[in-house]
Amino acid sequence: MSLAHSLKSFNSFGLAQSCADLVEAHSKEAVQAMCLPLWQQQLPMLVLGGGSNLVFTEDFNGTVVRVLSKGIKVSEDAEAFYLEVEAGENWHELIQFTLEHGMFGLENMALIPGTVGAAPIQNIGAYGVELCDVCDWVEYLDLPSGEFVRISTAECQFAYRESIFKDKLRNLAVVTAVGLRLVKRWQPRLAYGPLQSFDPATVTAREIFERVCQVRSEKLPDPAVLGNAGSFFKNPIVSAACYLDLAQRFPTIVGYAQADATVKLAAGWLIEQAGLKGFVLGNAAVHDKQALVLVNRGGATGRDICRLALHVIAQVQDKFGVVLEAEPRIMGANGEGDLYV
C-alpha cells in the first residue's frame, strides 16, 4: 500500500513512489523551521530540489521537504560580478538570467537539470567547467547547531562530483544559498568535443550556451517524455599507467588528462564499447543515443533501474577492468542506500 503523497512528479525518472509527508519550504527560514524538528527527533527526512539526481527504490517512510526558495542578488566590483542565489532557483534558468545581464562563465553548464541548492553537493559540471570554478561560497543550515553557516569554496572540499556535503556534512547540512563569482574578463572554455570548432578570439558566451543546449537536447532525452536522471555514471578517473595500458588495447578510447596526472575516461564510450547502447532490461534501458543515460521506458521501478545499472557496471568491468560509479542518490524506505537493493 503506497503512502499518502505521490513523488512521481517530483523525480525525473518518473518513478511511482510515495512518501508519508510532503512539505514545501519557500524561504531559508522555512527550511530551518521544517527540517530542525525532524532532525532533532531523528525522523526520516529527505530534502528535495529538482529530483533530478534520485532513484527511489521504495516508498519513503518520512517527510520530503521541497526547497522552493527563490531570489538572485547581484553586486559587482572592478573584477567580477557576485551573485547570491537561493537554493530553490532552477539552475538552467539562472544561466539564462546571467547571459541576459551580461554575466558570463556558466554557459558550459547549460541544461544541467536541477536546482542551485543541489549544485555544490555534486559539484556539477559539463564541457570542461565545474561549479567549483565559479563558486565563491555556500550557505547551509547546520542541523546539529540549528544555525546558518557560510563556508568558502576551499572549505567545500570540491572534487569531481564530490564535496564536503557528500562527506563530512552528509545528512548534517541543508544548502540554502550559493554565492557565485563571475569574472568580467571572461575566457571561453572550449576544450571539449562540440566546442572545439569555435574560435576563442571571436566566440561569444551566448554561442557556447546555444551549442551546449543543442548538443544536450540531441543526446539527452527529455525527462517529461522518457524518465531519466541525465548522466547516470561518473566518468572514471584512472592512473596514467592504467590509461596507457587501456589505450594500447583500445586505441580509440576517450580520455582527458587531469591536472594531477590522472586521466578521466569517458564512461559513455566504455558503456557503448561494451555493447550496451540501447540495451533493454525489463522497463529500464540504456539510452540508444547516449549510453551514459539510463531511462525509464514506462512503468520501470527504482529496483529495475538499479538492476540495469549493476549490469552495466559488471559488463564494463569485465571488458575494461574499470569500475563505474553511479551519480544519483539511491533512496530506500528510511534513507539513502546503494544499488544493491
UniProtKB/Swiss-Prot annotation:
It is an enzyme of class 1 (oxidoreductase). Its EC number is 1.3.1.98. GO terms for biological process: cell division; cell wall organization; peptidoglycan biosynthetic process; regulation of cell shape. The keyword Flavoprotein applies. GO terms for cellular component: cytosol. Keywords: Cell cycle, Cell division, Cell shape, Cell wall biogenesis/degradation, Cytoplasm, FAD, Flavoprotein, NADP, Oxidoreductase, Peptidoglycan synthesis. Residues 15-185 form the FAD-binding PCMH-type domain. The active site is at 161, 231 (proton donor), 327. Pfam families: FAD_binding_4 (PF01565), MurB_C (PF02873). Coiled coil: none annotated. This is UDP-N-acetylenolpyruvoylglucosamine reductase. It comes from Shewanella baltica (strain OS195).
